[in-house]
């Protein structure tokens, strides 16, 4: 197995960035990928777009998209006792939240640790034990005596709250634990792809859009697509692994990238899908298909941009999405990098334009 640059993944996973607060992540992307591209720029929603130009004039544009934001919270109220009432930003399930360590990031960039409050089970009636606490009812215990103490720390209403999770290799080091793999693992894929292509002569212009605000309505993808005006687009995102005792389904970790046929918001272009399958077979890369009936990816708003964009999604399976700790597999990460790199090396300008429906 090829070596994984764990430092990139560690920095991406441990960085804090909910929708609208993605600057920490965009700085990491720029740090690791700017040297491999011709230029980069930000759009007005904060998406970072990195561009590798073909030497051929009027080359078709291929857009890679991966979102930087993670699910988290903002502080909605500070009680007189110094507790922080939270408002979820993105989708949370109440069962995974009690007693989790979280980190508050102030507007000045200072970071403080707290714990999501939970009731002790002693004497709790059965109906309360079985209740899922709504995510907007949770509070953060900062270990302070008063609201005045909170103010002295510089914490204010509106500050970002994210899981405090340390990235690490697990007992089998092919398994990687961290927060925010949705979608930082795919941001890492795109960084590695741009670096792999740095010295390659391509028939297409490649635009990597590290997008914003996906978890709150797939908002950043559309303005990024309008900025780029791509001929085709590939969204990179995670999908749910179903290989645990709770699920026992088909998508397992470590079996290669996942090609999305459709999800609830996008029907992937069938010719683009077939080309991706062809590249995978040629490179002897395992792959699976996905039909995600709930949720969507950046492809949702990219394919509806302008007069329409040929698009599909390539995914990496992930355990425990939208929680404080997620698990991925190195093999899926590496094989997705290879698949995308080879696709971009092999795709011709004629093929790129032939994918358009009706031509």
Spans of model-derived segments:
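N-terminal hydrophobic/helix-forming segments and targeting peptides
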Residues: 1-359
